[in-house]
Amino acid sequence: PALSHALDRRVFHDFFQQAAKAVASKGISIALPLSVAGLSSATLVNELLEQLENSPLPARLLHLIIPAEAIFDHAESVQKLRLAGCRIVLSQMGRDLQIFNSLKANMADYLLLDGELCANVQGNLMDEMLITIIQGHAQRLGMKTIAGPVVLPLVIDTLSGIGVDLIYGDVIANAQPLDLLVNRSYFAIN
């Protein structure tokens, strides 16, 4: 936990010191991981919110990716981040559908499907049914679904047919360093 906590602190410190201004000037959203150890630390959460408050980046552009199971054990921290305007992305949404027995509307903004679940969805009826179930729960809860990384066009067709809201991966665009994106790319929509 101490290593994860230190890594979270370093990621946020480096982002706010080196990239937040450029990201804000482009008006693009950024998704950064937040570990369970970081989420459980009131000090780290407060530091994150302080850095956000002192940066030009609007909170609505900061998406925090947290493991899905952490939302219940650390609901207070998650709610604090959401009230500050941050978007919450629950990751590792996969075969364990029990989470939907406790997940309520307004607990998160996005559900990030497990990459393994999406990888061969075009040829696996069970994975397709699981994604369809997750998509239905997401709609009921007012959340958007994110799938990826996608490397085959056929997977995009299948995921789009299911109704997945957002898809990422090399078939959409090659991964690029953040510095390259904010300093050399053009964006038309904020």
Segments and roles (model prediction):
Residues 35-40, 61-72, 86-190:
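EAL-family c-di-GMP phosphodiesterase catalytic domain
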Residues 26, 55, 84, 140-141:
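Helix C-cap/helix->beta junction micro-motif
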Residues 47-54, 76-84, 129, 133-134:
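Catalytic-core regions built around general acid/base machinery
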Residues 5-76, 149:
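Catalytic core of bacterial c-di-GMP phosphodiesterases, primarily the EAL and HD-GYP domains
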Residues 1-2, 6, 121-125:
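Short, contiguous acidic/charged loop-to-helix segments that flank catalytic cores in large enzymes
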Residues 28, 56-58, 77-80, 112-114, ...:
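A short alpha-helix capping/helix-coil boundary motif
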Residues 1-2, 26-30, 80-89:
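Short charge-dense sequence patches
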